[in-house]
Design a protein with these regions (language model features):
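A well-structured
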Residues: 2-171
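Contiguous, non-catalytic segments that form substrate-binding/exosite surfaces or channel walls
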Residues: 114-256
């Protein structure tokens, strides 16, 4: 049986996902176990993978595969009664085209600069956090903001820079809608915060081991499968997927807090 265009697109996407999972694995290690002196080489690794991923996500080959799969789907639609299947595939095509158009507008040099700035910025942020000195991180932060604004300009002029950068996480989100949603909170939160600040401070002296055990028990209550989920510690908690059956969560615990 001849390979379909949809299958060819799937094979291409699988390779891209494998590269993305390698990128995520490096990021996980950077946050949870990498020695400080490994930061420079890690920056090179992450920058290289970001470059390769951008090339794949903006390539003519990717564009042709999407279009061929779209045409093939149109042929199937004319001869199929399974509209749910068709709608599902049409949505996939729509999202892939959106991703392709976004990537195609980006300058490869900017993609590399951003990847390098994020990696170096994370290193400086850790140092600034340890020393409680924001000035250490400030120049890296300013560089990241400048690059992000340029990224937004290259992608689209339809939204503000913030709205453009938010689209992969919150599609169609606008500042107008966001302001409307948060206005009630802006009206009520100040009084709540003042009340909290006036209340009696409660100190619960938990050892690191007790905090770790508490986090583990909570995850078990939520139904954690220990064959699928690994928990680590990082300066800032996050979750990340490294593969179809590999999910990582981090927490941050401090002695006496």
């Amino acid at each position: 049986m001849a390979e379909t265009h949809w299958n060819k697109l799937g094979a291409y996407l699988k390779e891209t996902q494998i590269l993305g999972s390698i990128q995520n694995t490096l990021y996980w290690d950077q946050n949870t176990g990498m020695p400080k002196k490994g930061a420079s080489w890690r920056s090179e690794q992450l920058t290289y993978i970001a470059k390769v991923l951008h090339e794949r996500n903006s390539s003519e080959e990717f564009s042709n595969l999407i279009q061929s799969a779209k045409n093939e789907l149109a042929d199937i639609e004319r001869n199929s009664d399974n509209q749910l299947f068709i709608k599902d595939k049409e949505r996939n095509i729509s999202l892939l085209l959106k991703e392709f158009n976004r990537e195609r507008n980006l300058d490869p040099k900017l993609v590399e600069s951003l990847a390098k700035a994020k990696s170096k910025g994370y290193e400086s942020w850790q140092e600034a956090k340890e020393k409680s000195d924001f000035k250490i991180f400030l120049p890296f932060f300013e560089e990241l903001v400048k690059l992000r604004i340029e990224e937004a300009k290259q992608i689209s002029d339809q939204y503000s820079p913030w709205e453009t950068l938010a689209q992969p996480f919150e599609p169609e989100l606008t500042l107008k809608w966001l302001n409307k949603m948060f206005q009630p909170l802006k009206d009520t939160l100040p009084e709540l915060i003042r009340g909290i600040n006036k209340s009696k401070k409660y100190h619960w002296d938990l050892s690191l081991e007790s905090q770790h055990n508490l986090c583990s028990q909570l995850l078990d209550e939520f139904g954690r499968d220990k064959d699928l989920v690994v928990v680590g510690k990082s300066p800032h908690p996050f979750s990340i997927t490294l593969g179809p059956n590999d999910y990582r969560i981090t927490t941050r615990i401090v002695e006496g807090e």
